[in-house]
A protein has these predicted regions:
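Conserved Rossmann-fold cofactor-binding substructure of NAD(P)-dependent oxidoreductases
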Residues: 192-212
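N-terminal Rossmann NAD(P)H-binding glycine-rich loop of SDR-like oxidoreductase domains
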Residues: 137-155
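A solvent-exposed beta-alpha-beta segment
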Residues: 1-91, 170-174, 189, 193
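Flexible, Lys/Arg-rich cytosolic regulatory linkers and terminal tails that connect or flank
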Residues: 76-136
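NAD(P)-cofactor binding segment of oxidoreductase domains
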Residues: 71-93, 161-168, 207, 212, ...
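Conserved beta-loop-beta element that borders a ligand/cofactor-binding pocket
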Residues: 252-255, 281-332, 353-361, 390-395
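Mid/C-terminal beta-alpha module of Rossmann-like enzyme folds, strongest
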Residues: 350-402
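Conserved Rossmann-fold NAD(P)-dependent oxidoreductase catalytic core, especially the SDR/UDP-sugar
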Residues: 86, 101-102, 215, 219-279, ...
């Protein structure tokens, strides 16, 4: 096994391996400093070229490469391609937060975030996360890509109870299974419900008495919103109004965190317009509920979320193409699920610590936009399929896209 990562994470994994695993680690590549020599008797290779030379000359008995750090500034594409060339398995080392047993490391399939053109931006500040400690928290859309990750993140900060709402029975089943696996089901209660069912929502809120609501439930896809405009308006606008009416009614509600989108700025699609309207409705409520806090969090496209281009491209590549791109000139700002969730949680806590204004809007700097066709080409090049074999089809922009 070869480890790739920063010094701290590599050392942490080596210590874990000594006590609880039996991997034979034969070398390290550290990407954050110029440390040479060895760590706990394991050789540090200077760079990828030195590793390539050793592999080429059969001087290493290696079958896998483990990436120990999830927030590296380096593009790891070369390591991935090198691993493929020498038939090595390559995995992310994932730290598992677990209430059942000792914390554990899992080997996960390689993630697209390792190949972004910018480092992952995780915003963590423990002094703000104390905001969630011992609180009752309500999360709408709790089984979706964003909502389910928010549930898992908040569990790290010892809430009193998390209450989750989702319209999908399958989503509720999946999030229940995931939380049970890590041993925190006693901290969570999940309900299948529609946020437009005002009577049921009011009964649940009266029963649960949450102090914080994170409103993530939404129809989020541009094309689906265009084809189902009544559902998009009902969910994104009237569903938000329903949650705000409950927020106004109950005194135990103190903080309303609204998950929005950068498409709400100068909206050109129905989905963007529904979020624009919902944001302004939040602002109207903030003006009359001066003793309560409102937070609006905007972010762009979320990589690897349900229905995003990454899982679509993966499936198309797995089926040997073609990979479909709407327009060769289209670009998008991207962020990762864990980036989006860290922004949401920090923004809510930051706004509470500010007494100057009871409503604020936060937006993460997502770096430079990424051309969708370049992302497709990169994913094809990193796949196990001959890149000359997979075709890219240009399909044209869908209604509402730009």
């Amino acid at each position: 096994t070869i480890l790739i990562g920063n010094e701290i994470d590599c050392y942490k994994f080596i210590k874990f391996n000594e006590s609880r695993s039996n991997l034979q680690i034969v070398g390290l590549i550290l990407l954050d400093n110029k440390l040479t020599g060895s760590i706990r008797g394991i050789s540090i290779f200077k760079n990828i070229d030195s590793l390539r030379l050793l592999l080429k000359n059969n001087r290493l008995n290696v079958d896998q490469v483990l990436i120990t750090s999830n927030n590296l500034k380096n593009d790891l594409s070369d390591f991935y391609l090198l691993s493929k060339k020498f038939n090595l398995n390559i995995y992310n080392v994932k730290f598992e937060f677990n209430n059942n047993t000792q914390d554990n490391f899992l080997l996960d399939e390689i993630n697209i975030e390792n190949f972004l053109s910018r480092p992952v931006k995780l915003i963590e500040d423990s002094k703000y996360y104390s905001f969630y400690e011992k609180k009752n928290i309500l999360i709408t859309g709790c089984g979706g890509s964003i909502g389910s990750q928010i549930v898992k993140e908040i569990l790290k900060y010892n809430p009193n109870k998390i209450y989750g709402l989702d319209i999908s029975e399958e989503n509720i089943f999946n999030i229940t299974q995931q939380i049970a696996k890590i041993g925190f089901l006693n901290k969570c209660k999940f309900f299948v419900t529609d946020i437009n069912n005002s009577e049921k929502i009011k009964n649940l809120i009266h029963q649960c008495k949450p102090e914080i609501v994170i409103h993530a439930a939404a129809i989020k896809h541009v094309s689906i919103s265009e084809d189902n405009c009544d559902v998009a308006i009902n969910t994104n606008v009237f569903g938000t109004i329903n949650m705000l009416e409950c927020f106004e009614k109950y005194d135990f509600f103190k903080d309303f965190i609204f998950v929005s989108t950068d498409k709400a700025v100068n909206p050109s699609s129905l989905m963007g317009m529904t979020k624009f309207l919902a944001e302004n409705i939040c602002r109207a409520y903030a003006q009359k509920l001066i003793n309560k806090n409102f937070t609006i969090v905007r972010f762009g496209n979320v990589l690897a979320s349900s229905g995003s281009v990454v899982p679509i491209f993966k499936e198309q590549i797995r089926n040997n193409g073609p990979v479909t791109v709407s327009d060769p000139n289209v670009d998008r700002y991207f962020m990762l699920i864990n980036e989006a969730c860290s922004l949401i949680l920090l923004a809510g806590a930051l706004n509470t610590s500010s007494k100057k204004n009871n409503i604020k809007t936060y937006l993460l700097d997502m770096g430079e936009p990424v051309k969708i066709i370049d992302l497709a080409k990169k994913m094809i090049s990193l796949s196990s399929v001959d890149k000359n074999y997979i075709k890219i089809d240009i399909t044209g922009l869908k209604k509402g896209e730009k």
